[in-house]
UniProtKB/Swiss-Prot annotation:
Protein name according to UniProt: tRNA (guanine-N(1)-)-methyltransferase
Gene from which this protein is expressed: trmD
PANTHER family: TRNA (GUANINE-N(1)-)-METHYLTRANSFERASE (PTHR46417:SF1)
Binding site for S-adenosyl-L-methionine: 111, 135-140
Matches recorded under SUPFAM superfamilies: alpha/beta knot
A molecular function (GO) term: tRNA (guanine(37)-N1)-methyltransferase activity
Organism the protein comes from: Clavibacter michiganensis subsp. michiganensis (strain NCPPB 382)
Length: 228
C-alpha cells in the first residue's frame, strides 16, 4: 500500500518509523511518502494561509500550494482515495478502516487553522475519490493527529503487517462488539485472580465466557453498537 501525507509539519510523522508500521515500511508492505506543504510555496515567507473571504476569525489555507501538492501526489494516476480530516466529515470506524485497508493508494491532506480552501477539495474530487473523515465530535488543532490515528488503524489491517492475523479478529469492533477482558500470568495478583474458566482448558467454555463478556461490556459502555 502507498500512503501519501501532505502537511506543514512533516516531522510529525517520524513516529511511523517505529513499531509495526516502521517494520512494514522497511519490508515494503507500506510505502509512506510525506510531503511538506511549504515546499510548494513560491514566496520567501513560504506562506500557506490567508484571511477568509466573508470575514471571521482565523486563517484559511490557500489553494495554490495545495493544488501543487495534489498535482505531485496524483501524478502517477493511481486512482487514490484522498482523505481530508474534517469535523464536518463522516465518522471514522473500524469498518471504514477495513474498507480502506484494501486500497492500493491512500492520500491524506492535513488541514490547519480554519481549514483548507473548499476549492481544493472540490478540484481534487474531479481527479480522485475524495472523502471528508472525522474522528469524532470534537475539534483538533490540525489534521495530523487524526491522520496518525487513521493510518495506525488502517495500516495494521494490511496483510502481513500484524504477525498473527487471528489477533485482529478478536479485537474491539472487529465484530461490532467491544473486546473481552484479557489476562496473563501470574494467576493471582494483589488479591485479584484470573477467572477460573480461562485456566480450565475448556475451549468451548472459554469462547462462551469471552462472548458473554463482549456482550456485557458493549451493553454497559457502548449500547449504540448493539442491534435494536
Amino acid at each position: 500500500m502507498r500512503i501519501d501525507i501532505v502537511s506543514i509539519f512533516p516531522e510529525f510523522f517520524g513516529v511511523l518509523d517505529i513499531s509495526l508500521l516502521g517494520r512494514a515500511r522497511q519490508s515494503g508492505l507500506i510505502d509512506l511518502r510525506v510531503h511538506d506543504l511549504r515546499a510548494f510555496t513560491h514566496d520567501r515567507h513560504r506562506t500557506v494561509d490567508d484571511t477568509p473571504y466573508g470575514g471571521g476569525a482565523g486563517m484559511v489555507m490557500r489553494p495554490e500550494p495545495w493544488g501543487e501538492a495534489m498535482d505531485e501526489v496524483l501524478a502517477d494516476d493511481t486512482d487514490p482515495v484522498v482523505i481530508f480530516p474534517s469535523p464536518a466529515g463522516e465518522v471514522f470506524t473500524q469498518a471504514m478502516a477495513q474498507e480502506l485497508s484494501a486500497e492500493p493508494h491512500l492520500a491524506f491532506g492535513c488541514g490547519r487553522y480554519e481549514g483548507i480552501d473548499q476549492r481544493v477539495v472540490d478540484h481534487t474530487a474531479t481527479r480522485a475519490r475524495v472523502r471528508l473523515v472525522s474522528l469524532g465530535d470534537y475539534v483538533l488543532n490540525g489534521g495530523e493527529v487524526a491522520v496518525m490515528a487513521m493510518i495506525e488503524a488502517i495500516g495494521r489491517l494490511v496483510p502481513g503487517v500484524v504477525g498473527n492475523p487471528a489477533s485482529l479478529v478478536e479485537e474491539s469492533h472487529s465484530e461490532g462488539l467491544l473486546e473481552h477482558p484479557s489476562y496473563t500470568k501470574p494467576p493471582e495478583w494483589r488479591g485479584l485472580a484470573v477467572p477460573d474458566v480461562l485456566r480450565s482448558g475448556n475451549h468451548a467454555a472459554i469462547a462462551a465466557w469471552r462472548r458473554e463478556q463482549q456482550l456485557e461490556r458493549t451493553r454497559r459502555v457502548r449500547p449504540d453498537l448493539l442491534p435494536e
